[in-house]
Amino acid sequence: KASQKLGIFYNTGEGGLHEDFYQYGKNTIVQVASGRFGVYKDYLEAGECIEIKIGQGAKPGIGGHLPGAKIVGDISKTRMIPVGSDAISPAPHHDIYSIEDLRQLVFSLKEATGYKKPIAVKVAAVHNVAAVASGIARSGADIIVIDGFRGGTGAAPTRIRDNVGIPIELALASVDKRLRDEGIRGNVSLVVGGSIRNSADVVKAIALGADACYIATAALMAMGCHLCRSCHLGKCNWGIATQVPELVKRLDPETGCNRLVNLVTAWTHEIKEMMGGMGINSIEALKGNRLMLRGVGLNSKELEILGIKHAGE
């Protein structure tokens, strides 16, 4: 509902999409992940874009686990799995072990939807992400989505979440440079997230070459999340990550929607103010404009990867 009011997109995640939300199709990105939960033709047709999720910034290289206690009622129906059964997402897609395999899935999804939907591929920000992105750009995908280190999740081991992956800024800059060097940057859009916590992070990402950004944890906090870090227990005190009826009632959808609209609207105003201070009057003029950025506390290699100068230069 907030996406509809703001004119932006929201992502279903890997758990499918309940039919009640089909009315928001013009603002929906449907996701196809390794578990393929809830994926069928009507689901693919329900959104404006299809995202193939290969990796996630908070847990590169591993899958996911939704406890059986959360698989009840509509969740069971939407994911198309039995009530009470654990939902296990494998680490890899078992039909994707090469760029050629990825290309086959990309074009299978395009064909299934009449070549009407753009296809995005989401990967985690890791050390070889530039090479991975180069392959994705050649697979026929329309959008490359990069998820950075410190992105949020309710289903990742602490040691993986806190120690695996690289910051989204370094991943974005290296991917943008690699695609430009190979002359294929114009073939795809770059969308980034993972540690996008405020409007300044959005400005930095666009200046480093992103076409768009997405948020998750910031949106949850706007809706009332208090970062209890107990999503996996299924007993969220704020009614967000739970299926317990008494707890679900604590989340007021209308209030959450209004707060999320306020957040994105405020960020939009702040971005305009920062752009005005730079003498830039359009987001297009900011995209890839590294002249607007300076590094503080970064070493020479990091500055080289980012393609920016140190403060004072």
Predicted regions, residues:
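Short, basic, helix/turn surface patches
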Residues: 33-48, 170-178, 237-250, 310-313
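Gly/Ser/Thr/Ala-enriched C-terminal appendages of enzymes
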Residues: 197-200, 206-312
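Residue-identity detector for threonine
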Residues: 12, 28, 78, 113, ...
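A generic structural signal for ordered alpha-helices
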Residues: 80-83, 87, 114, 122, ...
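Glycine-rich phosphate/ribose-binding loops and adjacent secondary-structure elements
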Residues: 19, 90-248
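N-terminal capping/small domains of soluble enzymes
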Residues: 1-94, 101-103, 258, 262, ...
